[in-house]
Amino acid sequence: MEYVRHVDFGAIERSGADERITQPLLDYASGAQSCTINCIKTPAGGGSPAGMDGHDVDQIFYILRGTMRIEIEGKEYDCGPGSLIVFPAGVRHRNWNAASEPTVHLAFNTPLPDPNKPFARSV
């Protein structure tokens, strides 16, 4: 197992302004046993592919760059760098980038999502 992992910020910078990128940092393929971690770049105007959704696991975002708008159970929040957002399992939510620059965040999912089930479900 690789104990130290790095976000490839160079790949994020080289990607197109309108391109969404997900970099797996910890997943089934890399030996995850308790959670998954992805670094995600969301372009301006982009966001939750499923719209308002929920998950069977807790989802935690840590914002690295930009400002992400979050809606949780009907209440909206603007979250900038250093913000930690917690979506408990089963709670309706969505996220999107309402700003003009891309956002970059870490997404933690715990416990380990079932690979045989869809991760997001529209609600």
Where are these regions (language model features)?
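Ligand-binding loop in jelly-roll beta-barrel domains
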Residues: 33, 89-115
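Short, solvent-exposed loop/turn positions at domain surfaces
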Residues: 36, 48-51, 57, 73
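Short, conserved beta-strand element in jelly-roll/cupin
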Residues: 39-42, 54-70
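Histidine-centered active-site/metal-ligand motif
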Residues: 51-55, 59, 93, 105
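Structural motif
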Residues: 60, 67-69, 76, 92, ...
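Short acidic-glycine-tyrosine-enriched beta hairpin
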Residues: 74-89
